[in-house]
A protein has these predicted regions:
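Structural transition elements
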Residues: 336-381, 402-404
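Gly/Pro-rich hinge or "lid" segments in bacterial periplasmic/extracellular proteins
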Residues: 59, 174-241, 245, 255
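Ligand/substrate-recognition segments at binding pockets and active sites
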Residues: 222-224, 369-451, 519-522
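Detector for C-terminal structural segments
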Residues: 319-352, 401-411, 438-549
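Surface-exposed binding/hinge segments that line
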Residues: 135-193
Length: 549
């Protein structure tokens, strides 16, 4: 799921001054738990673009959907538990059929949540008329690929209601990560009556919407920088939701954020980075959470044919000192990434070895090791092979100070080490950057992906030919074959599947078809007494578990 760094950097001098005020942050007189223990205020990473689970593509909308909706299963911290489903179902028919009994739960307007709500939502998701960029995530569910391609009707999708509270799901082939997939927002139910009444305005405002999760979104419309979630008393597990209200503030400037935190407007200030994080790292209220998200560069090989040259892409990657980028530019809130797949997310089912620490993965780090001398050599060879004397690229990046500094760092390194390359930075809002990527109107861009489910294929699939999220149009038949085998032929063979994914990662890393930069960590300031911020494998927080002492 698309992701970006939102908060701005401030100068060392300003951060130093702000840090002096942080002595008040740990003063009991300032403690947040002295106020309303049923209300919480936190900073938001970005405004919500849509609350339509069929159309959302970014991690920020996913967090809000996770707060207010739920599907068959739900992550509580790192543990997957039944949500609308009565239990975690076991597959039959050689792993290709799931029969799932549902709890008798309700929407926030009192309507029952039924099996048909799932059928409607899923069929809507794969219907080409909906225009979902995420319809590909249904691949493997019976007939999904054919429906997305317009070859079959949405009603032929492998899901049907066997009764008001019983679902049958049929697959084309086993999906090893099916259970975790069912926690994703793309598989949430929808109230057909509400969606059709609101039409193309559905998800653009909280007015008229209904929710089946722990909270309800109130008084929100697209473009708002503040919004409120209130406890959903109709939620089946409402008795275990400790907070009555969660207030979100989108904060662009760290000075503003620190001031709001210091004056107790915020209970939690999230997504610190750069100088801010570095200067506040010793505060007792500072903490970090790992995140299964990778930040990378996309090169538009369709618009700029020269970028199809492997040597040019390899050269660009070798100019990046990922250690300096993580430590200096990001203030140690990032980890150097040598592959698109995040570290500590997936383990070999037989040996327990991390996906990014195998012998092959470690050997492939030579393709991402800082080596300006080799970069220049490869660049000159690639330029000769493509008949280029110079290459002028527009570098699209988010218009936050952190990303601006990152873009300038890459610009300086690449122009210095790669003769004939000129990068012109175009800093634009997050939403504009996503639009440019989706329409192909970019040469080179910073992008990121946050796990929808903790499996290497969720990241590797981004580079498959024809994937809607493959904005750079990288294509390699051998890579595609390995990915296809991992998700189809060898789906029920853990050892063979693991090797397929390792092979795919090797091909992509060698090609630098997508150039990984760093893996994100989430740095935050949290008031004493605020508890339960447990991150899930998909990088979200289960706000139903958060409470104040």
């Amino acid at each position: 799921m698309k992701f970006f760094r939102h908060h701005k950097l401030i100068s060392v001098a300003l951060v130093g001054a702000a840090a002096l005020t942080l002595t008040g942050l740990i003063n009991p007189a300032h403690a947040a738990d002295g106020g309303d223990k049923k209300s919480l205020s936190v900073s938001a990473k970005a405004p919500i673009n849509t609350m339509d689970s069929s159309l959302n593509t970014d991690a920020y909308g996913a967090q809000s959907l996770n707060n207010t909706m739920e599907g068959l299963y739900r992550y509580t911290g790192q543990k997957l538990k039944p949500a609308v489903a009565q239990s975690i179902a076991k597959p039959t028919n050689d792993g290709k059929r799931y029969t799932i009994d549902l709890k008798k739960t309700k929407w926030s307007n009192g309507d029952p949540v039924t099996a048909n709500d799932f059928v409607y939502a899923w069929q809507r998701m794969v219907d080409p008329k909906t225009g979902s960029q995420y319809s590909y995530i249904y691949s493997g569910i019976k007939n999904a690929d054919a429906i997305v391609a317009g070859k079959k009707k949405p009603t032929e999708l492998g899901i049907k209601a066997l009764g008001p509270y019983k679902l049958q799901i049929d697959l084309d082939h086993p999906i090893p990560f099916f259970d975790t997939l069912m926690s994703s927002s793309q598989f949430y139910p929808l109230n057909k009556k509400v969606v059709e009444k609101l039409g193309d305005q559905y998800g653009l405002s909280s007015k008229g919407m209904v929710f089946n999760g722990p909270y309800k979104l109130q008084n929100w419309k697209v473009g708002d920088t503040e919004w409120t979630d209130v406890k959903n008393d109709s939620y089946w597990n409402a008795k275990n939701v400790k907070l009555n209200k969660v207030k979100y503030y989108t904060i662009a400037d760290p000075n503003t954020g620190l001031n709001l935190y210091d004056t107790n407007v915020l209970d939690r200030y999230q997504n610190l980075n750069g100088d801010t994080a570095r200067q506040l790292a010793n505060s007792k209220e500072f903490g970090t959470d790992p995140s299964n998200s990778t930040y990378y560069l996309e090169l538009n090989q369709k618009k700029i044919p020269a970028l199809k040259n492997q040597k040019l892409r390899q050269a660009m990657s070798l100019t990046i000192n990922r250690k300096d980028l993580a430590n200096i530019i990001l203030g140690k809130t990032g980890i150097p990434a040598h592959s698109l797949v995040p570290s500590k997310m997936s383990k070999d089912p037989q040996t327990g070895q991390d996906f990014t620490k195998t012998d092959q993965a470690l050997a492939d780090q030579k393709y991402t090791a800082y080596n300006p001398t080799l970069a220049k050599k490869l660049w000159q060879e690639g330029m000769k092979e493509t008949g280029q004397k110079e290459l002028n690229l527009t570098f699209t990046a988010d218009n936050t100070d952190t990303t601006k500094k990152l873009a300038e760092y890459l610009q300086n390194n690449m122009e210095k080490d790669l003769p004939g390359l000129k990068l012109t930075i175009s800093s634009v809002p997050f939403k504009t950057r996503l639009q440019r990527e989706a329409s192909g109107e970019f040469d080179m861009s910073t992008s990121a992906w946050n796990a929808d489910y903790p499996d290497p294929t969720n990241f590797l699939d981004l580079a498959t030919t024809g994937n809607p999220q493959n904005n750079g149009k990288y294509s390699n038949k051998a890579f595609d074959q390995q990915e296809k085998a991992a998700t189809t032929t060898n789906a029920n063979n853990p050892a063979a599947r693991w090797q397929n994914m390792q092979n795919a990662q090797h091909i992509l890393t060698q090609d630098q078809g997508i150039i990984p930069m760093y893996q994100d960590t989430t740095a935050s300031l949290t008031k004493p007494g605020v508890c339960g911020f447990n991150i899930t494998p998909t990088g979200q927080y289960d706000m139903a578990a958060v409470y104040k002492k």
